[in-house]
Amino acid sequence: MAKTQIKVFGFDHKVVDEAAKKLVSLAVATKNKFVGPIPMPTKREEVTILRSVHVNKKSREQFESRTHQRLVVLENPSSELLDKLKRLELPAGVGLKFKEK
């Protein structure tokens, strides 16, 4: 029994949810079994930099980026569905990772 895990990720959670819904609707339209979208833990990356170059060590600025993720698992996906998924139009700022199991 082949399973394909599709990880949807991006910086804006609303856009990531929208992309995950597109994947699910495509799976429903092609009558494939699926699980998800499952919310995965948000990755938070924080960077601290000095405001000035050589002086004022106490004056710093912090930036963070959050990467939101959703997981959709397809059970026995058809080749037609996989082709459609690879050509799917997604909003800007959303990425997909495919993993076969």
UniProtKB/Swiss-Prot annotation:
GO terms for cellular component: ribonucleoprotein complex; ribosome. InterPro entries: Ribosomal_uS10, Ribosomal_uS10_dom, Ribosomal_uS10_dom_sf. One of its GO terms (biological process) is translation. Keywords: Ribonucleoprotein, Ribosomal protein. GO terms for molecular function: structural constituent of ribosome; tRNA binding. It comes from the Bacteria. Transmembrane segments: none annotated. SUPFAM superfamilies: Ribosomal protein S10. The keyword Ribonucleoprotein applies. The keyword Membrane does not apply. NCBIfam families: PRK00596.1 (NF001861), rpsJ_bact (TIGR01049). Belongs to the universal ribosomal protein uS10 family. HAMAP family: Ribosomal_uS10. Part of the 30S ribosomal subunit. Involved in the binding of tRNA to the ribosomes. This is Small ribosomal subunit protein uS10. It comes from Mycoplasmopsis synoviae (strain 53) (Mycoplasma synoviae). The lineage of its organism: Bacteria, Bacillati, Mycoplasmatota, Mycoplasmoidales, Metamycoplasmataceae.
